[in-house]
Amino acid sequence: MQKITVPTWAEINLDNLRFNLNNIKNLLEEDIKICGVIKADAYGHGAVEVAKLLEKEKVDYLAVARTAEGIELRQNGITLPILNLGYTPDEAFEDSIKNKITMTVYSLETAQKINEIAKSLGEKACVHVKIDSGMTRSEEHTSELQS
């Protein structure tokens, strides 16, 4: 059987992105924060280019799926806060801390490891605590946390 392939592509017009972002901002209260999720190379549209536009348009945060994506943004001059939505392996803790990438933490043990590495670097680590609120998508459960 002959396999027929159809070439596919995606194009992004940064002016349209800017227009859409500003329309969204106009619908929101002034104190609402916006996080531009640009994981997977901004879904194939070029993370650095999209991040530069979002930074210029004053979004509040950026989110990626891997440490390497956040480091690439830092290496290209992006200064916005960056949240890594994905799992950060132990060997990426130091790079995340040095590049001021907020790590998603799934367990108390991981938070403690990150804290020790940050102390040894003389830095503060930024973390985002993921809590299983009933969908069983993470290790940490609300019943295990102390107030």
Q: Where are each of the predicted segments found?
A:
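Active-site-proximal beta-alpha core segment in soluble small-molecule metabolic enzymes
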Residues: I4, T8-E11, N16-F19, E29-S143
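Hydrophobic alpha-helical segments, chiefly the membrane-spanning helices
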Residues: L145-S147
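Short, basic/glycine-rich phosphate-binding loops at helix/coil junctions
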Residues: M1
